[in-house]
């Protein structure tokens, strides 16, 4: 087995417990990004406001890009990134996120723009919390930097959607 450190890109595939924890955390974030991608796609397809639809499409694309970026790190660490099962360290957060985005279809059909924005806000709030928990993990520096950048972008999206929800209320 190769020696593993927590700095730079030196964590390589292996079976040690720390590597497994990093892979598990990243897989949970992949699930969170995947669910956010789907939620924002659904929101964009079902909202009549063109400005909001464009914003939601951009957030959907962002989450898809984040998902792919995290998958690359999982693959580099020897994990299988194609699995999007929410199991491991952040399963509760991923489950809460999924439940938040599941309600998006109900909001589209029954509650109009306010309900839709509320559901987007809930989904991003759960994502922010999941990323905060993930950042407590001892990631290698390069992965920690990626997760931190994604966290800040999701936090900005959350703040923006929250503001739009207040305007529409």
Residue ranges and their predicted role:
Residues 1-23:
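Extreme N-terminal tail/first-helix region
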Residues 2-10, 72-128:
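Carboxylate-rich helix-loop segments that flank metal/cofactor sites and access channels
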Residues 15-48, 114-137:
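Alpha-helical bundle segments that constitute or directly flank the non-heme di-iron/ferroxidase center
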Residues 21-29, 50-69, 89, 113-119, ...:
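Alpha-helical scaffold segments that form or flank carboxylate-/histidine-based iron centers
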Residues 29, 36, 66, 73, ...:
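Amphipathic alpha-helices that form helix-helix packing interfaces
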Residues 40-48, 77, 81, 108-111, ...:
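Secondary-structure edge/capping motif, primarily at the C-terminal ends of alpha-helices
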Residues 53-94, 161-164, 168:
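Conserved alpha-helical segments that form or flank metal/cofactor-binding pockets of metalloenzymes
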Residues 116-169:
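Preference for long, well-ordered alpha-helical segments
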């Amino acid at each position: 087995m190769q020696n593993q450190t927590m700095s730079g890109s030196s964590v390589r595939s292996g079976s040690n417990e720390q590597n497994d924890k990093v892979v598990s955390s990243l897989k949970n974030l992949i699930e969170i990004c995947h669910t956010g991608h789907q939620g924002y796609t659904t929101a964009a397809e079902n909202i009549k406001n063109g400005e909001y639809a464009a914003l939601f499409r951009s957030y959907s694309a962002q989450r898809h890009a984040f998902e792919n970026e995290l998958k690359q790190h999982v693959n580099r660490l020897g994990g299988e990134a194609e699995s999007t099962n929410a199991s491991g360290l952040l399963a509760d957060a991923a489950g809460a996120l999924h439940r938040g985005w599941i309600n998006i279809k109900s909001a589209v059909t029954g509650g109009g723009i306010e309900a839709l924005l509320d559901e987007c806000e809930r989904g991003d709030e759960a994502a922010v919390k999941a990323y905060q928990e993930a950042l407590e993990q001892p990631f290698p520096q390069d992965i920690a930097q990626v997760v931190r950048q994604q966290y800040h972008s999701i936090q900005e999206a959350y703040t923006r959607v929250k503001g739009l929800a207040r305007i529409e209320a």
